[in-house]
Amino acid sequence: MIENQLIKGEIVAALLAVEKDFENCRFVSCDFSEKEISGVSFSNCEFSSCNLSMARMNKTSFHSVIFNDCKMLGLYFDQCNPFGLTVAFNNCILNHSSFYKTKLKGIGFLNCQLIETDFTQTDLSSGSFSGSNLSGAHFEQSNLEKCDFRMAIHYSINPTMNRIKKARFSKEEIHGLLSCFDLSIE
């Protein structure tokens, strides 16, 4: 187990070859893109300015992990270990990723790009999408109760196919809730 370390740049590939458990570590400018991180456990870790695009994450554990300014294209969080999955994203690009059937109560997606991201059957209750772009994101049979979408843009959420009780939306983006009804709003 590697604990309490600052891990920068290219050293991460060598570490992943020999170690599978990281606790209280900070990863800065590391390239995990297309890397095999299946079965690796990250606990109380922070990733800053890292590239995790297309990383393979089968049974990967993320417990109390924060991602800041990371590029994370095409990731399948639905393949991660669901036990204790707690993550937060700040200024991250998560386009074309999948959170299918994951439980992420209270999650924060702050100022993120979530273009064409799949949230089908995902529990996002009490989460926040403040400042995030949800263009083409897919919500179906998702729990969005008490979610904050007030500062989010370009979302399209069908209220008849998702749980949205007590969720908060801005007047400017209300058309994202009504587009499924083919209404003319002027």
Spell out what each predicted region is:
Residues 1-186:
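Tandem repeat scaffolds
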